Structures are given as structure tokens and as C-alpha cells.
């Protein structure tokens, strides 16, 4: 495989939303790619993807297909979302990052993970605020009502 093909494959895989518990799309993508390569992927009862060419493989490669996530705990009156972490990621690592919110019906919304009162030009204490579930929220890029 050429380097450019590997980069394109990784870009396609990275674009798939796969928070913990929602990895079916990423698994299906990988299974399809393995089939195209002439391999025979098998899905386990737990949803893991196994690809074996020999009864006793000489090399084993394991990888996570789920991404770090959060779970909505509350919809605020102004339409922002309060969330709790899924996994042990530090809040400040993702502050200001775009996120995708997966609704219970499968609908997706884009938004941004922000500290409360994120405007540095009016909030002189923004650098001192501890980042936590109590001080962070998701602002959706959509018109919302609660």
C-alpha cells in the first residue's frame, strides 16, 4: 500500500463517529476494507473484529475503534448541553474542539466543547477556572429550545 493510500484510509476511518458503544460503523468499514484486501474478517459475539489468515497467527495486532466521548446529562434553558465524560480524558485537552452529538434517533448535531463564559476579553479569570463537568458545556451549532 502506498503512503498516500494509507493516509487516505486513516482519514476515512477518523471521520467515522465511534464513541464508546457506537462502533458498528467503524467495524463495518474495517471489515469491508479487509474483505477488499482478500481477507476473511469475522465478528465476535462481543462485536470485536478478528482477521486471521492462519490457525495460529505469528503476529497479533490489536486496536481500539472507539473514540473518547461524553454523555449528555442535561439540556440547559439556553440550549447548551451539560455532559459527563465517557473515559478518562482531561477536559482541557478538548476545550474549543468541535464535537458531534448523537441523538437517540440517530440524528447528529455539531457543536463545540466550551468552558462556561469562554470569552477571554470579558472573563479575566478564565485561565484560573478548573475545567470539569460543572464548568464545561457543549454549544450546539443549531437553533435549539428546551
Residue ranges and their predicted role:
Residues 1-146:
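N-terminal hydrophobic/helix-forming segments and targeting peptides
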Amino acid at each position: 500500500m502506498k503512503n498516500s493510500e494509507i493516509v487516505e484510509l486513516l482519514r476515512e476511518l477518523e471521520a467515522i463517529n465511534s464513541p464508546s458503544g457506537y462502533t458498528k460503523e467503524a467495524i463495518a468499514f474495517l471489515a469491508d476494507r479487509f474483505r477488499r484486501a482478500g481477507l476473511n474478517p469475522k465478528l465476535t459475539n462481543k462485536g470485536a473484529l478478528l482477521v486471521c489468515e492462519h490457525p495460529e497467527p505469528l503476529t497479533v495486532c490489536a486496536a481500539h475503534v472507539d473514540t473518547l466521548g461524553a454523555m449528555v446529562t442535561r439540556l440547559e434553558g439556553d440550549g447548551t448541553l451539560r455532559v459527563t465524560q465517557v473515559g478518562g480524558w482531561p477536559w482541557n485537552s478538548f476545550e474549543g474542539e468541535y464535537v458531534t452529538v448523537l441523538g437517540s434517533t440517530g440524528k447528529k448535531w455539531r457543536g463545540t466543547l466550551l468552558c462556561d463564559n469562554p470569552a477571554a476579553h470579558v472573563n479575566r479569570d478564565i485561565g484560573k477556572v478548573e475545567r470539569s463537568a460543572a464548568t464545561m458545556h457543549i454549544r450546539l451549532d443549531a437553533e435549539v429550545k428546551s
